């Protein structure tokens, strides 16, 4: 499972609710929030699965 985060970080994210579970066992509200976290983690954060953790 992977997500293309090449267009991130974004300064603002929508409130769209499409949860993504990260490899840190944290649930992100949507792809934008997840990808911003990936950038902050220098690429160490990955997708565990889609949906809540």
Swiss-Prot record:
Glycans are attached at residue 42. Its main location: secreted. Keywords: Disulfide bond, Glycoprotein, Protease inhibitor, Repeat, Secreted, Serine protease inhibitor. Pfam families: Kazal_1. GO terms for molecular function: serine-type endopeptidase inhibitor activity. SUPFAM superfamilies: Kazal-type serine protease inhibitors. GO terms for cellular component: extracellular space. Gene3D superfamilies: 3.30.60.30. Disulfide bonds join 5-35, 13-32, 21-53. This is Ovomucoid. It comes from Polyplectron bicalcaratum (Grey peacock-pheasant).
